[in-house]
Every structure is written in structure tokens, then in C-alpha cells.
């Protein structure tokens, strides 16, 4: 059962406004969601912060998010803080998110890290639909638990799926299953002693594989790599012993990408 009286829903639709910048065309949300009005940190790039007025996700919480980024929009979506998944007891918390990015539109989806507490169980499913001219920078950062309390990999289970389609054809699928009961999370094929994991996907972004590799190599405290996926798109996987190194790496990649995109005439 959801902690709230109804399923938690968020709807956001954007378009190009009269001044040529991305604006909110329509939105709807139920508790605990809220939206901040867009602001414009650089040129025609809009930034919207998603707010969740709650201490975190609990047993039975179910979130349904639908985001539609209009044609020619340039938008960065952020969150207000680290997201906490509390003890879900014998249940789980879930999120289903569907994102549509229109023609010649750019979306930088940059939430803060996800922290599963002891005995937390979370299921996340994200589907992103793009056009051939859409540009996407999408990431998630997963933490091993409440690291400061030495509560590492004490969560029950964490399962996230990311599916990206371009013109209705699948170009990327990620199926992350972290189950400490059945897998040694410190195995060299898993976290290998690290506590924070970054998964970042770039589609049609104006940055070369060699450029991303250089940013990874110059990032202190980061063990990561970049690989090419379908049609020369890029995927970055990185580990660290804190959130800051991964957030800094992500920001460097995003800064290079958005500077190039917003400079286009």
C-alpha cells in the first residue's frame, strides 16, 4: 500500500516559449512531488528541479513519472537532494518513469544519488523514447548504503532497468540487479571495495569517446571506463569511494556537452 492516499504521480510537458526558450507547457503532480519554475543558468538551456517533500521512499510507495520534452527544447532536470530508500520491511518501493524527447531537443537528466537503507527493496523502470535528432545525457548514481554509518550493502535488493529507444528501435538496455543476499558486492566484478556507482548514457551528444576517456583519467579517486554503444553513442560506468568524485566527473561531461549544444546557432 502506498504511504500516500493515492499513487504518487508527476506529469511534465515542455515547449519553446515566445522568447525562444524552453518553458513548461503543462504539469500535474500529487504528493510528495512538486516542481520548481524553470530558470536559465546559461543561454537557452532551461533547468527544472524536481522536488519530493518527503523523507524518502517507504514500503508500498509507488511513483509514476511521465516527462515530455518538446521539440527544440534544451532542458536540464535535477533533484533537490540525495534520494533515500528506507527499510521497506516485507515489501518494496517502486518508480516507473517514461521520458519522451522530441525532435532536435536536448535533455540532461541529472538526479542526485540513490541511497538504499538497511533492508530496503527498490524497483525502478525507466523507458526513454527519442527521435533521430534528439540528444540525451542520462545518469544514475547508486550508493552502497549509509556509508558514514558503515552500513554497506545491508539493503535487501535493488533492481533498476533503463531502456532507450530511438525512432522506436532499441539502442540501449541496462538491467542492474544488486542483491547482497546472493552476490558478494565487494567481488572484483562488482563494487570491488568501492561504495558508489555511476551509470551514464550519452546519445547524440557532441563529445568524442577519447574526450570522455580523458575526463575519466583526470578524475582523482574514480575507477571508470567509457564504451561505444549503438550508432556511436556512449556509455560510462565508474566507481568511487564517495559521491563527490562521481558528481564532479558527471558535471565535467555535462558541462562540455551543454556548452557545445547551447553555442549552436
Swiss-Prot record:
It comes from the Bacteria. GO terms for molecular function: nickel cation binding. It is found in: Cytoplasm. One of its GO terms (cellular component) is cytoplasm. Its main location: cytoplasm. InterPro entries: UreD. UreH, UreF and UreG form a complex that acts as a GTP-hydrolysis-dependent molecular chaperone, activating the urease apoprotein by helping to assemble the nickel containing metallocenter of UreC. The UreE protein probably delivers the nickel. Required for maturation of urease via the functional incorporation of the urease nickel metallocenter. Belongs to the UreD family. This is Urease accessory protein UreH. It comes from Helicobacter pylori (strain P12). The gene is ureH.
Amino acid at each position: 500500500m502506498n504511504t500516500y492516499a493515492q499513487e504518487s504521480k508527476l506529469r511534465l510537458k515542455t515547449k519553446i516559449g515566445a522568447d525562444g526558450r524552453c518553458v513548461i507547457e503543462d504539469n500535474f503532480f500529487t504528493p510528495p512531488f512538486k516542481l520548481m519554475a524553470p530558470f536559465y543558468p546559461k543561454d537557452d538551456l532551461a533547468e527544472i528541479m524536481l522536488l519530493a517533500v518527503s523523507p524518502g521512499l517507504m514500503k508500498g510507495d509507488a511513483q509514476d513519472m511521465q516527462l515530455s520534452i518538446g521539440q527544440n527544447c534544451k532542458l536540464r532536470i535535477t533533484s533537490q537532494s540525495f534520494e533515500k530508500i528506507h527499510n521497506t520491511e516485507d515489501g518494496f518501493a517502486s518508480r516507473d518513469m517514461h521520458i519522451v524527447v522530441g525532435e532536435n531537443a536536448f535533455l540532461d537528466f541529472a538526479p542526485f544519488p540513490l541511497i538504499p537503507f538497511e533492508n530496503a527493496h527498490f524497483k525502478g523502470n525507466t523507458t526513454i523514447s527519442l527521435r533521430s535528432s534528439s540528444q540525451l545525457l542520462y545518469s544514475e548514481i547508486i550508493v552502497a548504503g549509509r556509508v558514514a554509518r558503515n552500513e554497506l550493502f545491508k539493503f535487501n535488493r535493488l533492481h533498476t532497468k533503463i531502456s532507450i529507444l530511438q525512432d522506436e528501435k532499441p539502442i540501449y538496455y541496462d538491467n542492474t540487479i544488486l542483491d547482497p543476499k546472493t552476490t558478494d558486492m565487494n567481488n572484483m566484478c562488482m563494487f570491488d571495495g568501492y561504495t558508489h556507482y555511476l551509470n551514464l548514457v550519452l546519445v547524440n551528444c557532441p563529445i568524442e569517446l577519447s574526450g570522455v576517456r580523458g575526463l575519466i583519467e583526470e578524475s582523482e579517486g574514480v575507477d571508470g571506463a567509457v564504451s561505444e554503444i549503438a550508432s556511436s553513442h556512449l556509455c560510462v560506468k565508474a566507481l568511487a569511494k564517495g559521491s563527490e568524485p562521481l558528481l564532479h566527473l558527471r558535471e565535467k561531461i555535462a558541462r562540455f556537452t551543454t556548452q557545445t549544444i547551447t553555442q549552436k546557432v
